[in-house]
UniProtKB/Swiss-Prot annotation:
Keyword RNA-binding: yes
A molecular function GO annotation: RNA binding
Residue stretches of biased makeup (Gly residues): 563-572
SUPFAM superfamilies, per the entry: Winged helix' DNA-binding domain
PANTHER family: LA-RELATED PROTEIN 1, LUPUS LA PROTEIN-RELATED
Function: May act as an RNA-binding protein.
Protein name: La RNA-binding domain-containing protein LHP1
Biased composition (Acidic residues): 885-895
Source organism of this protein record: Cryptococcus neoformans var. grubii serotype A (strain H99 / ATCC 208821 / CBS 10515 / FGSC 9487) (Filobasidiella neoformans var. grubii)
GO biological-process terms attached to the record: positive regulation of translation
Biased composition (Basic and acidic residues): 95-143, 228-244, 296-314, 359-371, 405-428, 452-468, 485-495, 873-884
Length: 895
């Protein structure tokens, strides 16, 4: 391939970058579609040329003319002031330009702001990169073709120096003149402008014999422009290594190696040391000489070395060393800084460690003091300063036993005080009641710590002499303290302590004479204006000793039975009434002499005096009188512990009572102790297996007294009678909806209630118990309230009854009284009462029928005790008021 063909092909390859040529300022040259070159060549000589730019401009103009004449291009040729130029067609470049212009109009889709802001620079760098590669190819081709025409090294070096200040070339353009005509040395102003602006313009390069000077100028010009283009440097190094001749070796001469800088004539560190030492030492020397304190420089060094100790805590020896060293430094003995090997300048590690250890010890002591304070406060009260004490679970039976002991002791004290008052009122003399021990126990129980309670419990279990009564209060305190402490006692210990307390109380308590019993009995009957009735159903034929009676539940503290009468019964739940019992006798007979038992500790029970609706009368003192039992007037045993039925008088089933309290048999706590579990209900109901669960309260006590009744029928009877009680019917609308027009209810409906089914699933047993009741009337498979009460609770829209009116029914015989009762007359309740003789003659029932009026229901629901009718008799207002005053006085005294 000839040099001209190579140059032509190279130019054609590089022609697409013609519109990316930059001027001296780095701006793109806006070339028109048809660019022209000078038409008239002005030959100049290389020797007379003053600048490489002019020579190159002339050469390119001549080559443009030669290309125009020899090989014309299809592009249009236009003539301008500088001459004809050939238009280079570049579709690829135009497409790229159009695409870039559209991109500029739209904006870049890139999210990088750097790409958007440097869009033009990126395009320029791409053009320069391509131009550098093409220029290196062109230069290699030119050197291989122009080897025979290489000029002298001297002229080449001069030309390179003249071209070193030229602008950048987009590529190395090789151009030669058509002949060896000399180039004009003095070009016109138009030619100079052309040299400055189109120094990289595109022109066809197809000379046959290019001159040596022109080639060298172009090569050196491109080399000079490559110095500013970092992309062309690697190509330049390769070119210098492979080119021949001394010219390329001279041009590719590397720069001299960098040498280390000579050391400075002045050492800055020595100069700084000389300048800093007098400034720091000289002003402190005077002050240290006068005051004798260490200089500032020494203090700063000690702080930077990690000095942690305080100067006050240092020893005198270390301080003297520091002062001497500081004084020597202040006197100017040494101009250099003190040595690091001087031990006096470093902090005392041992002393610093002691200071740190002392601080830690102080913190630990503060923490211990705080913990001890919180522990002491936690012992005094259940809630500590910042955190709760650790909770220790306590078995339920221990809590129940402790609560029972505490309640029993307080009740015993109240009974003793009431007994003393009642004896004083009646003129009877009683010995020392021994209330000092309960008083002491009550005072001890309130502020008893857990540790003392535990000790007291052990002593109480060991002692069996007369001093056991004084230990009873401490035992109660221990039971109370177990809820907050960690005391864990066995059940046997609880039972033994309880039995010892009871026995000691029995020994210490005096007995009441029979005359005192008779006097109290007569006074109570006189006060209520009622007489004993011989037809009263006898009590169960068994006796109770003190151990079993002490575990009996008692009434609430400070009030009699009548206060919580209708306190909380909810529909068919536990009966909370303290209503009267079914028999006619208002007070029990034969306290200790039932069935001819003249002596002994028979724990007989009576019923309270009944009001118009079977309500107990406030202020009337009624209580079991048991010699030596410590139970006085004003309180009666409460079978329903912890709020289960507040105040039924205890009539025990014969079988259960005989089994639990027979001769020589275990009773009360002893029975529970033998079983290994303390069961307060064992002393009340006997061995009742079905009520071991705490979730099932015992059923209400029956108001009808039936002797020798087995436990099952005893409980069923009490539950059934509660369903038909005034307290339940006043709230149980569902049960009233089951009544027909005559008040009859299906027995199967009653037997389907959950409490009845928990006792027995047999409907026949339920019917049998209903027949035993004094307040219910049974016919076939129906049951209703007896007497006129059957119509009181019937709803207006009740279904018609399948039974017609019974001529023998008391409701027909007492129709007038029933109508008066429906109208709410006050005398209605009295008119419904019949004597016991009439009942015996008729053989109907052994107990009076309850005749409820509208006012009775209201009084029962509102817990009203100010009734004008007492025991079926209309009292005068003065008498009622006097009775109320007496009741209030006794209650206040008990509280």
């Amino acid at each position: 391939m000839s040099p001209s063909q190579q140059q032509t092909s190279v130019f054609n390859a590089l022609g697409s970058y013609a519109d990316r040529i930059k001027d001296a300022n780095g701006n793109f040259i806006k070339s028109s579609p048809s660019s022209s070159s000078s038409a008239t060549p002005e030959p100049t000589s290389l020797s007379s040329s003053t600048s490489g730019k002019k020579a190159f401009s002339t050469a390119t103009s001549k080559s443009g003319q030669q290309k125009q004449g020899s090989s014309p291009q299809p592009g249009a040729i236009t003539a301008e002031d500088d001459g004809p130029w050939e238009t280079v067609q570049s579709t690829r470049a135009r497409q790229r330009t159009d695409r870039s212009e559209e991109k500029e109009k739209r904006g870049s889709s890139s999210k990088n702001w750097r790409e958007r802001s440097h869009r033009d620079e990126k395009n320029q760098d791409d053009g320069e990169k391509r131009n550098g590669r093409e220029r290196s190819k062109k230069e290699k081709g030119d050197k291989s073709n122009s080897a025979p025409f290489v000029g002298s090294a001297t002229s080449s070096e001069k030309t390179a120096k003249s071209l070193s200040s030229s602008t950048k070339n987009a590529w190395g353009v090789t151009s030669s003149s058509q002949g060896e005509n000399p180039i004009a040395s003095n070009p016109g102003p138009k030619q100079k402008a052309q040299n400055d602006s189109t120094f990289r313009s595109s022109s066809a390069a197809a000379p046959v014999g290019p001159t040596t000077s022109t080639i060298n100028e172009i090569i050196k010009q491109s080399e000079g422009s490559d110095e500013d283009n970092w992309r062309a440097r690697p190509a330049k190094v390769e070119k210098n290594e492979k080119t021949e001749g001394p010219v390329s070796i001279t041009q590719a001469q590397p720069q001299p190696q960098r040498q280390l800088a000579p050391p400075p004539s002045v050492n800055i560190w020595d100069l700084r040391k000389k300048m800093s030492v007098p400034v720091l030492v000289s002003p402190t020397s005077a002050t240290s000489a006068v005051a004798g304190i260490p200089p500032k420089s020494d203090k700063e060094k000690s702080l930077t070395n990690g000095m942690v100790k305080e100067e006050d805590s240092g020893t005198g020896k270390s301080l003297s060393k520091k002062k001497s060293a500081a004084a020597a430094a202040a006197a100017g003995t040494s101009s250099t800084p003190p040595s690091i090997h001087d031990a006096t300048l470093w902090p005392d590690i041992i002393q610093a460690a002691e200071v740190v250890k002392a601080g830690e010890d102080k913190k630990e002591k503060a923490k211990e003091r705080l913990n001890s304070e919180s522990a002491s406060v936690a012992e005094e009260s259940t809630i500590g300063i910042g955190k709760k004490p650790k909770w220790t679970p306590i078995p339920a039976h221990e809590l129940l036993a402790a609560a029972d002991h505490a309640a029993e002791q307080s009740r015993r004290q109240n009974r003793m005080e009431a007994k003393k008052r009642s004896s004083g009122r009646e003129g009877g003399e009683s010995g020392p009641t021994g209330s000092g021990a309960p008083g002491k126990s009550n005072k001890t129980r309130k502020g008893m710590p857990a540790a003392e309670g535990k000790k007291a419990r052990k002593e109480g279990a060991q002692q069996k002499d007369g001093h056991a009564s004084s230990k009873a209060g401490e035992t109660i305190g221990a039971g109370t303290g177990k809820a907050n402490g960690d005391v864990k006692e066995t059940k046997e210990g609880d039972a033994r302590s309880a039995s010892q307390q009871e026995s000691s109380s029995h020994r210490s308590g005096p007995s009441i004479s029979a005359s005192a019993n008779t006097g109290i009995d007569s006074s109570l009957h006189a006060r209520t204006k009622s007489t004993p009735n011989a037809s009263t159903t006898p009590l169960p034929p068994h006796t109770f000793n003190l151990a079993s009676s002490s575990n009996l539940p008692r009434s609430t503290r400070g009030r009699g039975e009548g206060r919580g009468s209708f306190g909380g019964g909810r529909a068919r739940g536990g009966f909370r009434s303290s209503g009267a019992l079914g028999h006619k006798g208002q007070l029990g007979h034969g306290y200790g002499h039932v069935h001819g038992q003249g002596q002994g500790f028979g724990y007989g029970y009576g019923s309270p005096p009944m009001g118009v609706a079977g309500l107990p009368v406030e202020g009337i003192i009624y209580a079991p009188l048991n010699p030596g039992a410590g139970a006085g007037a004003g309180a009666s045993p409460n079978l329903y512990q912890r709020g289960y039925g507040m105040g039924f008088q205890p009539f025990y089933p014969a079988a259960t009572a005989a089994a639990s309290a027979g001769e020589g048999g275990p009773t009360g706590a002893a029975a529970g102790d033998a079983a290994g579990v303390y069961d307060p209900a064992a002393a009340v109901y006997g061995n009742m297996g079905m009520y071991k669960s705490a979730s099932m309260p015992p059923p209400p006590m029956p108001q009808t007294v039936v002797p020798n009744l087995d436990p099952l029928r005893f409980y069923v009877l009490g539950q059934v009678e509660y369903y038909f009680s005034m307290q339940n019917l006043a709230m149980d609308f569902f049960l009233r909806q089951q009544m027909d027009s005559e008040g009859w209810i299906d027995i199967a409906m009653i037997a389907s209630f959950n409490r009845i089914k928990s006792l027995t699933p047999e409907t026949s047993i339920v019917r049998e118990c209903m027949i035993l009741s004094n307040y219910l009337e049974v016919r076939e498979d129906k049951v209703r309230l007896s007497g006129a009460e059957s119509h009181r609770w019937v709803l207006p829209d009740a279904a018609p009854s399948k039974f017609g009116p019974d001529p023998r029914s008391p409701s027909l015989a007492e129709g007038a009284e029933s109508s008066e009762e429906r109208d709410g007359a006050a005398s209605g309740s009295q008119s419904g009462l019949v004597t016991a003789g009439e009942e015996g003659a008729q053989g109907l029932q052994a107990s009076p029928r309850r005749m409820f009026g509208a006012q009775d229901v209201k009084d029962a629901l509102m817990k009203s005790s100010a009734l004008s009718t007492v025991n079926g008799e209309i009292k005068e207002k003065e008498e009622v008021k006097a009775m109320e005053n007496e009741g209030e006085e006794s209650e206040n005294y008990e509280q």
